[in-house]
Amino acid sequence: MKRFTLVVAAVFAVTRSFGAVSCEKYDDGRPDKSVRNEFNKMYPDAKDVEWDAEAGYWKVSFEKGNQPNRIDHEAWYAEDGTWVRTVSEYPVAKVPQGIKDLLSGSQYGELPLEDREVEYFETSSYGKFYRFDLWQNGREIKIDVHESGEVLPASYDVM
């Protein structure tokens, strides 16, 4: 009986350790080592990592955190490993109140939200901002609320 208990404990420990290991998938080949190194430096605790080549960039989808607080992210890198942007999906409830106040005090403040998720952009060229999907006259519009206080229609590509 003692041996059986030890075997069960060992199997449990091994399977738990596999669950904590981050697996990587490469759908479009494998990015250069400089790209992978930059990603690993920026996001050492990333889980469920998937790489894709898209529009001349490497896009890596990953998760951070544990349930129920796990957050989905996408980081984009140039071919040389230069970080371009990271987009994270947060529940509206997790958006800082100051950002929500900026949106509600703007001309878009009365428009209903399209869904309960908000994208948070960190970019190398446009700074940091939250992107809200809102409904206006039966169609979806995207509004960016910058941490600097600007509230603007999302009219530019963030690459």
What is each of the regions a protein language model found here?
Residues M1-R30, F39:
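Bacterial Sec-dependent N-terminal signal peptides
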Residues P31-E50:
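Post-signal peptide N-terminal segment of mature Sec-exported envelope proteins
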Residues F39, A46, V60, I99, ...:
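Short, structured motif recognition centered on aromatic/hydrophobic residues
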Residues K47-N66, P112-R131:
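A cross-family detector of function-defining hotspots
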Residues Y57-S88, R131-V158:
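Amphipathic N-proximal alpha-helical interface segments
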Residues E79-E114:
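Long, charged/polar, surface-exposed segments that mediate recognition or autoinhibition
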